[in-house]
């Protein structure tokens, strides 16, 4: 194992964690992520607080549909209750942020936030916006849409107040406004130095367990079976979602594993009408980008030849795939996203263990800290560790990594 030290100046007031590790995948999860490579789809889920999200729907889109699934929470939940400790306010927000991140590591979705502050219960959206700077929070939602480029947007709450909390209704109002604003170059043009405008195809409200007569025969409502079983994970999405939701420990959450068919309903709020389901007419294959057809064929070959007992056999083909994506795909969004996914798969197939940790948990500006990093690979492929970077510090190593050492 190669160990190295690096001393550098830290400019943050707080180091988030004294230890950092990459996620490690078993062979079935590697296979699942190989299949995700062949899907170019994105969904954004919008709500107000940690624990507002529908973890079943997020699990379904991330693992069944193989989408990039993202949850944007308007707040970090710092105005809520704490059932596991005495932390309140900002410190509770830190705890609930980590609970959300832990939930996403289980259900496979991504997590982002706006700058909105959870100031406690709010009677209506007007009161909420009197505390929040509406334009600033709207800019955050627009940024999220332009950043993750969702094909569809799903709101947890309606704009009409049935959510029972001003924050809930405000999150829906912001989502509907951002749906159009993200495609308008005159709205928040300062963002366009970094992202492009984006028009999602549709925006839906994720309905609250409606009665059959409320949804039957309605052309603007579609049902999604989120209870299907994933053989690679050995779990249904209801089971996966219950594990994810149980991460909200400060709120006393812990839900029983649900199994069997479960329908969630989506009501179209804006966007193009659909025929069969919420994704009708949306191309989520590599054909949506120029040069993608050949990439799809290469990925299919890698999947067909994948060995569960020796995933490292796929590494040479993954390196070639990464090179091909970077040279032949001109759409920067999908090129960067899929190239990163391939890099993560190479690390997973190589059995890499990468860890970095600091000797202290927090520092003040100008202080020095010692960072220790460890790298080990456990495959029969040959790797060289070229350099290690911490922020703007670069250590050139050019060291060969021996197997399992």
Predicted regions, residues:
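Active-site rim/loop-helix segments in enzyme catalytic domains that contact anionic ligands
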Residues: 20-147, 169, 173-180, 184
């Amino acid at each position: 194992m190669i160990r190295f030290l690096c001393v550098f100046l830290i400019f943050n007031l707080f180091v988030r964690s004294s230890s950092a590790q990459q996620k490690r995948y078993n062979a079935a999860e590697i296979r699942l992520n190989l299949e995700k490579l062949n899907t170019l789809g994105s969904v954004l889920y919008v709500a107000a607080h940690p624990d507002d999200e529908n973890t079943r729907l997020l699990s379904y889109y991330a693992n069944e549909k193989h989408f990039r699934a993202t949850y944007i929470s308007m707040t970090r939940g710092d105005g809520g209750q704490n059932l596991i400790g005495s932390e309140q306010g900002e410190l509770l927000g830190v705890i609930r942020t980590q609970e959300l991140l832990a939930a996403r590591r289980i259900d496979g979705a991504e997590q982002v936030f706006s700058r909105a502050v959870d100031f406690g219960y709010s009677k209506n959206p007007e009161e909420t916006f009197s505390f929040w700077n509406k334009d600033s929070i709207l800019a955050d939602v627009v940024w999220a849409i332009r950043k993750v480029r969702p094909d569809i947007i799903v709101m947890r709450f309606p704009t009409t107040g049935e959510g029972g909390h001003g924050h809930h209704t405000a999150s829906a109002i912001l989502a509907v406004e951002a749906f159009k604003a993200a495609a308008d170059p005159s709205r928040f043009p300062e963002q366009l130095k970094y992202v492009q405008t984006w028009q999602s195809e549709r925006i839906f409200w994720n309905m609250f367990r409606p009665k059959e007569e409320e949804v039957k025969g309605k052309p603007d409502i579609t049902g999604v079976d989120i209870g299907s079983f994933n053989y690679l994970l050995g779990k249904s999405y209801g089971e996966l979602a219950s594990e994810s939701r149980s991460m909200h420990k400060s709120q006393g959450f812990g839900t029983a594993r649900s199994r069997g068919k479960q329908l969630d309903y989506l009501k179209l709020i804006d966007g193009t009408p659909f025929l069969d389901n919420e994704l009708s007419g949306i191309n989520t294959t590599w054909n949506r980008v120029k040069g993608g057809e050949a990439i799809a064929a290469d990925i299919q070959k890698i999947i067909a030849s994948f060995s569960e007992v020796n995933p490292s056999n796929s590494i040479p083909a993954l390196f070639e795939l990464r090179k091909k994506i970077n040279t032949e795909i001109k759409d920067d969004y999908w090129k960067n996203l899929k190239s990163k996914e391939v890099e993560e798969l190479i690390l997973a197939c190589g059995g890499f263990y990468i860890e970095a940790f600091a000797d202290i948990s927090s520092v003040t500006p100008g202080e020095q800290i010692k960072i220790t990093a460890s790298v080990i690979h456990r495959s029969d492929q040959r790797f060289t560790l070229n350099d290690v970077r911490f922020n703007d510090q670069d250590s050139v190593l050019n060291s060969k990594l021996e197997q399992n050492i």
